[in-house]
Amino acid sequence: FQAEDGIRDQPRSRGLGDVYKRQDLELYLKSSFFSDVALSPDGKHLAFQSKSDEFTEGLLVARTDDFLDPKKGLEKATVAKAALENSGDDVLRVKELFLCRFNWVSNSLILVEICGKNFDRLRGEIFTALGVFKLFNIETKEFKNFLYPLEPAPKKGSMTFADRYRPATFISKYDDESILMSVAENKRGFRYAHLRRVFFDKRGVKPNGTDLYVSKQPCQFKVGYKANSACNIPYIFILDKDKKPALTFSSDLDGVYAHYADDKTTKIDIDLEDYTPFAIKDDLLWMYGVSGIGAHNVSLLNLKTKKIQKAVPSDCHSVISAMNSLNEATPYAIDMECDGKKEIIYFDQEKRDAQILSQLAPSFPDKNISLGNWTDKNDKAIFSVSDSSVVSEFFMLDLTKGTLIPIGRTSNVPKDKLHKMVSKKFKTRDGETIYGFLTLPKGEVKRLIVYIHGGPYGIRDYDQYDFSEQYLASKGAAVLKVNYRGSGGYGKNFMEDAYKEWGGTLLNDIADATIAVQKELGIGRSQTCAFGASYGGYAALGMAYKHSDLYECVAGGMGVYDMKILRDGSDESIYTYQDDYEETAEKFWGDDQAQLVDFSPVFNADKMNSRILMWHGLQDPISPIVHLELMKEALDKNNVPYQAFTMSKLGHTFGEKEDIKAHLPVLKDFLFDEL
């Protein structure tokens, strides 16, 4: 990286101590051995999704009994491996492929979905479900291409791209010979969802099979010359208990609608844009309420009365996981946060699985809990717990033996090196309730560091592993994360009421939580710093003049510092090229010029009284480098000391491991006033 100082001296040279710092950081950056595990329908095999420093990305399948036998272990238990090359796909214009999901579809076959990672000039870094699937046979070891969405161009005649492109979406396992997929077929310029039974022994990579239902309502609509597609949403078809289509969905300019899977694809005229449907039982459609990245409640739509009713207590928010019994789509329990605390909400406490869960859960307090993946005999399942202090830990529940057997932890970091995020509840200055997390070091609290999440709208912090947080806590920092107003997972009003409040309500919420924790820990301004990236970088610099009485130092990465050029689009962020940029900008930031100046760090440099560090990627397309340049000019003009560095290859991200090992120790030293 390139270091730049405004007025301050150059950072001191680095010696042997820095080597140890990098070694400590290496521990927290080490990739997990596996990220997910699934039990085969007969329970005889475990499939691990792997992408670690030791193993190539792909699947590793082991015999269950041998794997759980301490005398044999993984090496002797392994029966099959499938590796995925991370190269891109030029035809689909994807720069990188990765394994995003997998499902056991028989005792010997695993369906693997391949997704794409790309960079779009208009949308930035995007992760895309491509409709690419591979089939892994653990007996023959064949890892073959199963579905590919784009047919080759015909040798004679012509065929439009729309006619050639037929993406498929996995809906459900059907039987030992086939699965159910939704295939979007083009007809007269529109796409229609086909619920199709696709057989494993089919030839080629076309999504050929037997149609069980064809929607008469297009799942794609046009606005001008552009088309919007709802064809590949995971819930495009919802099945009944017999795996027959019950509902399908469509969208238009006004909303998202359910349709009965009848002869006419009859529309249910209720806008479901704020919901994600996921199951149906009798006349009740089960749905998650969606705000940003988080589902914030569970609601039921009565298909007869057309009324929607919440199914969980009013103080519950932020769905963590749903628990389902074998072959049932409706959950018997939901793991949620209620008033900021983890809690399991039971819908049917008489069910066997609910009683099992109620016996297991108390042994894992304040953990994110999941129970599912039952075998066909309904006697074995996967039980998992996760949070910041264990990362993820998997167990096999064996009812015939009455045992809960550890499978493994996903993390390579020893538990004694991990720190627990404790949920917190705060009252704001205007009487609202907000939530957050406080992570304490194992020894003396040397600093309070407020780690501000990005977004800001729709994003939120969870009790989960974060290498930056764990690294800072290992050095003696108490780390505070605040889900200020505007964060996702707490409801649409909680998010949208914070629009046009970047430098107002949002910063006040963070400040109010900071004051509460300072009092709790007996810590003052001299030991308190704030940092973040993206919106968090903006907020950190905003704290230097809005709430400088609370923060001795602030560190902002990849931040937007001039809201006037953000608002009018002259910073040339990738988002300014979108057709609806003006509409979005008005909604998020408004047109009050005085407020835009008040909320912009570049126009308030003379009021900044905290130590300042900034870092930025020269390739950042979302918060262009002009924001850092303008901020430095403003600080220089007002003789305000600061430190800054840029990284030549970095975009709007912390980067790869080597990038993080370069800049995170610098950030740590600054926050601890050791730079």
Regions found by a protein language model. Give the residues of each.
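Single conserved hydrophobic/aromatic residue that forms the stacking wall/gate
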Residues: 1-20
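Beta-propeller folds
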Residues: 18-380, 388-390
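Non-catalytic accessory segments flanking enzyme active sites
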Residues: 235-236, 343-442, 461, 467-470, ...
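Hydrophobic/aromatic beta-strand patches that form the interior of the parallel beta-sheet core
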Residues: 247, 332, 422-424, 450, ...
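Flexible loop/turn segments at secondary-structure boundaries
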Residues: 275, 294-296, 318-320, 339-342, ...
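Conserved beta-strand segments of alpha/beta enzyme cores
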Residues: 403, 478, 641-643
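Cap/lid segment of the alpha/beta-hydrolase catalytic domain
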Residues: 413-520, 524-526, 533-534
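Active-site-proximal cap/loop segments of hydrolase catalytic domains
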Residues: 484-675
